[in-house]
């Protein structure tokens, strides 16, 4: 009994403490005035008049959604020449993501998986990088994770409120970044496939209403996105210098799993080993629990990598290390269920040994 009491207290401490730890750790990264090139671009966009901001984004690769949010938040924080407010918005969206892990993942799965979800998120270097990055990736991570979790919630027990949350989260995601749009599209395809395979006919109406609404709301910017992509293909000089190589793939792994100074070979090997071991546990969890939700989530991320690879090999190199980041919440869920299954299997074997 004493052991169970101590163990329960430990899980409760982790469940309540990890979001606080994330806020303290990631919050430290926003207390700086240093900006890299893309962050400086975001800062310059915030200083523009509203009409000029919209006009420039029409010729850029991204919609004005993030820059509008950033401009509003920056001025609410007092503006000025200090950049902490720009970074703080990313930190707050990352905190929102952690709270999704704390409450929503716990509701849909259990507290143990929720703790593992938050723990892996806190330990992955890419999360610390993007938490202090004045770009749209933290915002996209929040909205795409909410999209995925609300979809599973709808699958379990559909309500009008859940469909509204799912639709709004999807709109927020597609307006964040082009690759967030791609990931949302792929997730919708997989979600529809699950609806058909599982004969969930009662979900088809809500699915198409949501999909049509997202498409309608995004349609003004879809034309801009397609035009930009066509122009990039048309005026590409065909140089292989801009195409992805094996080193590019290794660099993506390094960005996800390590700090800048870590030797790239070690990072790739250990990162892939971690992924394989946890994937083995996750597949076992899916089979034992007859629940493919984490597999659908991870499949979305994997398909995004394939799409990015094709674009990188045929058009020009995509920076998939950060472009795929909005889907990292799906990967963390996959890791969480995998680790939960591995620990459960280990405990089961220990009981047999000592029985």
Where are these regions (language model features)?
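Membrane-interfacial, low-structure loops and terminal tails that flank and connect transmembrane helices
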Residues: 1-10, 285-289, 348
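Membrane-proximal helix-loop-helix interfaces that form the catalytic/acceptor-binding platform
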Residues: 13-344, 354-355
């Amino acid at each position: 009994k004493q052991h169970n009491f101590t163990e329960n207290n430990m899980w409760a401490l982790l469940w309540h403490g990890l979001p606080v730890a994330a806020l303290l750790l990631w919050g430290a990264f926003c207390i700086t005035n240093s900006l890299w090139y893309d962050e400086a671009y975001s800062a310059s966009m915030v200083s523009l008049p509203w009409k000029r901001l919209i006009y420039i984004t029409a010729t850029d690769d991204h919609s004005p959604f993030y820059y509008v949010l950033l401009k509003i938040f920056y001025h609410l924080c007092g503006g000025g020449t200090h950049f902490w407010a720009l970074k703080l918005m990313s930190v707050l969206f990352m905190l929102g993501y952690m709270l999704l892990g704390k409450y929503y993942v716990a509701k849909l799965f259990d507290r143990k998986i929720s703790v593992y979800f938050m723990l892996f998120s806190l330990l992955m270097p890419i999360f610390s990088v993007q938490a202090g990055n004045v770009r749209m990736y933290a915002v996209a991570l929040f909205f795409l994770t909410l999209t995925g979790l609300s979809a599973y919630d709808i699958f379990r027990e559909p309500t009008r409120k859940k469909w509204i949350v799912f639709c709004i989260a999807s709109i927020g995601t597609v307006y964040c970044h082009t690759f967030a749009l791609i990931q949302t599209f792929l997730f919708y395809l997989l979600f529809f496939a699950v609806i058909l395979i599982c004969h969930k006919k009662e979900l088809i109406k809500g699915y198409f209403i949501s999909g049509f609404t997202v498409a309608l709301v995004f349609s003004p910017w879809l034309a801009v996105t397609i035009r930009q992509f066509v122009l990039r293909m048309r005026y590409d000089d065909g140089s292989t210098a801009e195409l992805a190589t094996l080193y590019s793939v290794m660099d993506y792994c390094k960005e996800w799993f390590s700090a800048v100074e870590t030797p790239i070979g070690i990072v790739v090997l250990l990162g892939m080993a971690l992924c394989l071991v946890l994937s083995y546990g996750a597949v076992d969890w899916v089979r034992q629990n007859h629940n493919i939700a984490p597999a659908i989530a991870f499949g979305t991320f994997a398909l995004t990598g394939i799409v990015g690879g094709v674009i990188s090999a045929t058009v020009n190199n995509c920076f998939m290390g950060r472009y795929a980041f909005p889907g990292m919440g799906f990967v963390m869920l996959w890791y969480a269920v995998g680790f939960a299954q591995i620990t459960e299997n280990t405990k089961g074997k220990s009981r047999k040994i000592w029985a």
